[in-house]
């Protein structure tokens, strides 16, 4: 009966049914494409709007100087401890912005000029936007369409993700190529296991993406995530997804070629010198990092004696929207359920390879979390999808309405997405300051990770105030003398002399009429006593806020400030360093 019925159905009904199915699939595909396009548009808008609203950080100035060195001398080892790929993209962006600014079109509309800050950050904002698409592709491959769409939307809207993409650092590019590589990797598995085609093109695409990943940031151990995922299937006799020795050799050859194409400066001897100096921790410019009001040594090799192990867990708890945190906690145990498929092991290895080393290492910055954020958001999307299904079943028990069940599920998803959307809009363009209600909201903004939350964003505005006040040849003491000098030079004040606040010898040169800059996030063991005394006893002549949060104070040196500085310098010279 069953076979007969099937044959009758396929003979009599299938033509019309197939036409209707094609229409449905076409409509669904069009809806998905429209949804993804909207996500990309919104995500791009959030990432590029007022991209130059904040001044450069000291780290970003180093990138700008590397760009200038490339333009002046060709390929060099400038900023050589970091790979070249991102710096090449920054160079192209800065050159393009200059040509845009020189065009006749912009000459008639000065408001269309692109600042150096915006040009330097644009590649990260662009690549960060398309990370949403890669998250969608990867999460859909593992967990299905719904999880893929939710995870992509979370990335597009999340204030932390936006903030990471709006700085000129390597982490965004690392994540982009990591996701691209693993999407190709999973596709190669699907093709090999199904026997529906040749997996080799996906192998070589994976290898090329991994080469670009290493040319973005020297963190090769993340390649182990994909290798570990591959390895767990090799003990299963039925597995068809096997590269073999020959294809592995080709894989690494392609990976190496892509790495060299994207990072040719690795062939320069001076680059290896820069990397060796950096790996020896001889480039650490400051002796502490302020975390939750306490100073800690921030050095990788100190391990658990450096930054607290719970640094990134505090970040997750206080810097992500609360519904996202709760959804992550719901989704995490679900990853251990077999019914979620074998692709979940890639997610579990991703967590293992990131959280285990980054929890125990002694040097930490919030931007390192860029690599972990996609896996957190994918897991949160799994939790949202699960809660939506549970809500749908709960509504079904109360109401006999298919429309109501689907409506309830959709409302839950939209409610979760509304929180990061509102959070990002409310803090724009200073996304790093976002702190959720568990962390105290705006009242505690900037108090957990001040170095990363402020990231020298107000230094440019502080210098603008100083150049209007400072007499010729005045000294300016700060923890970022190079950055101060950069903006003073742009303002036509090459006469100003820059001093390091932590250098007692240079601080001894201060005289009345000079200036001291105290920027939040720049408190260290070496300046803590002086900073505390100035903040408690002196009145700043200039105060600069980042949004609604005080960020920087400028003190004019008079007799009282000079006495305070002298006592601190004398105390250090007596052996109290």
Spell out what each predicted region is.
Residues 57-58, 141, 160, 166-173:
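Short acidic/glycine- and proline-prone juxtamembrane loop motifs at membrane-interface regions
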Residues 68, 82-84, 88-89, 224-343, ...:
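Transmembrane-lumen/periplasm boundary regions of multi-pass, lipid-linked membrane glycan transferases
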Residues 175-176, 205, 219-234, 323-329, ...:
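Transmembrane-embedded, aromatic-rich helix segments that form part
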Residues 118, 122-143, 180, 184:
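Transmembrane-helix motifs of polytopic, lipid-linked glycan transferases
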Residues 140-142, 146, 181-203, 213, ...:
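Membrane-interface transmembrane helices that cradle and orient dolichyl/undecaprenyl
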Residues 497-577:
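Aromatic/acidic, Gly/Pro-rich catalytic loop(s) in extracytoplasmic/lumenal soluble domains
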Residues 38-39, 102-111, 135-157, 176, ...:
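Transmembrane-helix signature of polytopic, membrane-embedded enzymes
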Residues 40-43, 151-156, 163, 183, ...:
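Short helix- or helix-capping micro-motifs
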